[in-house]
Amino acid sequence: LFAIFIYLLYKNIFTLVLGILWIITPYIMGTISKEKEKKTQIERLNKQEKDYVIDIAKRTWQFFDEFLNEKNNFLIPDNYQEDRKEKIVSRTSSTNIGLSLLAVISAYDLKFIDIKRCIDLLNNILTNVQTLEKWNGNLYNWYNTKTKKPLIPRYISTVDSGNFVGYLFVVKTFLENIKIENEALEQKIDNLLLIINNMIENTDFSPLYDHEHQ
């Protein structure tokens, strides 16, 4: 009898505990969710902080705005230094080119330039990149911005080439999103998308992959 009593008591307690857990689980999960929401809330910048960040963005954009020009074949120079005779260097990399594309669409998003200038700059950059000598579709790591020739020694950087293709996907998404709102520029946008898609499809990373060291 004692054994039966213990069994029934254990069974009832077990059932009771399960019942309590079943009842309070929604409350526990709700509390956890609220705590996560509080932790993930983004603290917004005040006006002074926002003005400060925008000012930095404008001054950063000035570099691209000044040097993305016909003189440099719309290939953004690698760097600029005030304290040397030749302040600007006549070389660029695939990562630099990709960053210049992102700088252009960011300048549009921040309303530093209008949509027409944005599309014109993207077109000038991409049409010049089309004419650059490549290896299996991959951009070489360094080019002369005046002659558009690869710098010696010629080599491919998997990191920089991968960066560039990643930037192309970002620009592609941007163009697809703005196309709906800009019917007057639809043909130009379609042409840019065609250039980008061809560049992505023609960039072959397989020769850079070492199958013996997976």
Label each residue range with its predicted role.
Residues 1-213:
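Acidic, mature catalytic/reactive cores of soluble proteins
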